[in-house]
Each structure stands twice: as C-alpha cells, then as structure tokens.
Amino acid sequence: MSQRHSPKEFLQLELVHVARDSAVFQYTEGSGATIACFNFTAPEGILLHQKLRERGLTSSVFSVNNVFPHDWSCIKQSVARTGRLVVLDDSKSINLLGYALLHEVAEACPASQRIIVTREAEIDFGVSPDTFHIDYDALVYRLVSEPSKEPTVV
C-alpha cells in the first residue's frame, strides 16, 4: 500500500505472534482484554491498549487480515483467558468481518464481554461515512467496570 493512501504514519510494531496463514498478527500480550483490529484500525487498537494500561488493565492486540477461511483460534484463546473482546472495524461494508468474529467468540466463550466499534451510520442506506470515531473514555470505562454479558455495538 502506498503511503499516499493513508494520512497516518505506518506503525512498525514488534510481533508477538503471526498466524501460519498471515491472517492474524499479535502485537501485545495481556490478561485483561483482547482487542481485534480489522481493516486500518491497528493504530486505534494500540492507543486503546495504552489507555487500558494506564488504568491497570493489560490487553492483547491483534490485527486481522481478510483471509478465508478464518482461523481465529489465537484470538478465541485470548478471549477465553481475558473474558473481554473489543472489535474495532472501520470497514465501510455492511457485512463487517468483525461480526463473524463476534459470532465465533460468542459460541466459544459465551460468558465473555463483547464490544464492537464501527463507523457511525448516519444514513439508513448507502455508503458509510469516512469518519471512524472512538470514545476512548467511555470504552475504557466499560472495560474496567463490571463486564456486561451482552454484546455491545458502539
């Protein structure tokens, strides 16, 4: 991908784990939350990781590529350990890959707290807006307070 396509600097992070098919990259290891980043949300996932760490909650951050079939076993193992999953997906499609991960995690770890952050839909039908906004304070509060058992869409 050309730098001109992205207004952000590219992150150069050390890897903790790479899936055999290069579908999943893990950048951090933690026991308090699992963060799965789809599309171009790895920088936001790392920022959320840092904000959680400031509140005493460590997290595992994964970047997920769109590879079929999906092997998210390392993410599901992390959720089984942490009990919390945050999916960040800034894709413009209405068929977000993040929803498929939420479904698999719900089956594998039904007691886990599951939150997905997507683009805001300002219109009933059509193309999603270019903005992707995360209310980090509200998200961190949700994660460090008593976990909800119901999936949440933000």
Predicted regions mapped to residue ranges:
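Thiamine diphosphate
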Residues: 2-154
